[in-house]
């Protein structure tokens, strides 16, 4: 709330109160107008209607509790979209997870169930105090980083998300290599069961004809076999084998 100072001036036996200046009146009206504009924007999303909005100049403060970080992010995004808003202060609380290990598992499942996370993408991450850090590389045919952000932000208990996901450059030669590698790889009895390319324990990142092998395979036989298949694929300039084995 904006508070206007009240001044009392003693003159002989009379006291006078300073009248509010025209500037303070106009400022209060501007604050009220901006507050109303923000409230209207937030009311378009039913989940955000419980938030309290206060305004001081071009600074807007949002206060309250929301169910997920996604809702919090939406509140901030909508507020910034209002004309006249310069800065936004968030005093929005999001419930924390009871068990961070369970939260980490929920994040992993959200990524695994994302239909467009394939063998050609690779993500790593961690979680601390509800803050999810995610980094890696994904193929460029769609905005996978944005879609993953939404999936993870809607998980109860997530407090924030730090995304450092690189979209690989579009490259027709790389696409051709992916097709050629998959044809060779899935002819092997060791890898044919992964033909769908979904939720594979290993990942193959192709960038400008350089191939990086990441993740896990059963043993050294599979690790060396995959490296050989990839290295013998016509057009591959170099293979970086970072595969780990389960035994």
What residue ranges belong to the model's regions?
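N-terminal targeting leaders
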Residues: 2-247
């Amino acid at each position: 709330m904006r508070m206007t100072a009240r001044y009392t001036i003693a003159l002989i036996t009379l006291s006078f109160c300073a009248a509010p200046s025209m500037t303070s009146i106009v400022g209060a009206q501007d604050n009220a107008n901006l507050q109303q504009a923000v409230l209207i924007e937030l009311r378009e999303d039913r989940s955000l209607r419980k938030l309290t909005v206060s305004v001081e100049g071009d600074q807007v403060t949002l206060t309250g509790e929301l169910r997920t970080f996604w809702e919090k992010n939406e509140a901030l995004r909508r507020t910034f979209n209002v004309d006249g808003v310069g800065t936004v202060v968030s005093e929005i609380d999001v419930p924390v997870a009871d068990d961070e290990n369970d939260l980490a598992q929920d994040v992993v499942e959200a990524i695994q169930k994302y239909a467009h996370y394939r063998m050609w993408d690779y993500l790593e991450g961690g979680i601390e105090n509800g803050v999810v850090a995610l980094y890696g590389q994904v193929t460029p045919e769609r905005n996978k980083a944005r879609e993953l952000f939404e999936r993870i932000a809607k998980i109860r208990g997530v407090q924030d998300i730090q995304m450092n996901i690189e979209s690989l450059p579009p490259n027709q030669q790389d696409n051709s290599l992916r097709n050629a590698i998959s044809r060779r790889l899935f002819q092997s009895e060791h890898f044919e069961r992964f033909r769908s390319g979904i939720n594979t324990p290993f990942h193959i990142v192709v960038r400008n004809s350089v191939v990086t092998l990441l993740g896990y395979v059963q043993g050294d036989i599979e690790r060396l076999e995959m490296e050989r298949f990839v290295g013998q694929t016509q057009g591959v300039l170099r293979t970086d084998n970072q595969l780990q084995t389960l035994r």
